[in-house]
Amino acid sequence: MMATQSKDERGKRRRDVKMEFIIPSEPQLPEKRISESQEIQLDIIARTNFNFFKGREIAEWLRKNHKMWRAVLLPLNFISLRDMDDGHWHADTLYIYPEDGYQFALEEIMREQFHADETSWIGGSRAMQMLGTSEVADKSYVILEAWWD
């Protein structure tokens, strides 16, 4: 709103209010929030480092680029039970559930920037079974699997 001062026909001051609407050229989407459980997983990723897997860098990048993904997970193998007491976390595969439209950008970033040895996609019935939803049954690029040797 914009207030202006003017005089009426009798010479008395009059206050006019002029409504002004500003429409941004780019639609403003609400900021995505990282859930508490996802923060725990990002902390685990940040603490994991081996060969070319630089967990701290990957977790930092994922936090800054949260608009590109729905969830990330670095599951461990049961061999971790043996060595966890010594502080070792045996995990070599990062799973990313991307936001639509960011699938191939995320794959390229994992390969080029973070030197994943292999990347592949989980889609169709396998993705449906893993996520427990039929919404992804007809999609080929649902979960990005990035593996480091």
Can you say where each PLM-predicted feature lies in the sequence?
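Acidic, proline/glycine-rich low-complexity IDRs
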Residues: 117-149
